[in-house]
């Protein structure tokens, strides 16, 4: 997910996006723990997307 796509969303949409990313991260972590996750880079990508969303939420709260 690109930061430019996220910047166009408001805080409520970013909150929903964060919630869905956290659920996805949990699912991927469970798959990794049970050794069902073939592509482990997905976990890193989701973690970085979460960081992007949280950064934008912080920036929007400061304005």
Swiss-Prot record:
Family annotation (Gene3D superfamilies): 1.10.287.310
Keywords: Ribonucleoprotein, Ribosomal protein
Entry keyword annotation includes Ribosomal protein: yes
Gene Ontology MF, one: structural constituent of ribosome
Source organism, top-level taxon: Bacteria
HAMAP family registered for this protein in UniProt: Ribosomal_uL29
Family: Belongs to the universal ribosomal protein uL29 family.
Protein name: Large ribosomal subunit protein uL29
Encoding gene, per UniProt annotation: rpmC
């Amino acid at each position: 997910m690109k930061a430019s796509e996220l910047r166009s969303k408001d805080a409520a949409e970013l909150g929903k996006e964060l919630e869905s990313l956290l659920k996805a991260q949990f699912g991927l972590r469970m798959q990794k723990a049970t050794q069902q996750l073939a592509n482990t880079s997905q976990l890193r990508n989701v973690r970085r997307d979460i960081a992007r969303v949280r950064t934008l939420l912080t920036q929007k709260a400061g304005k």
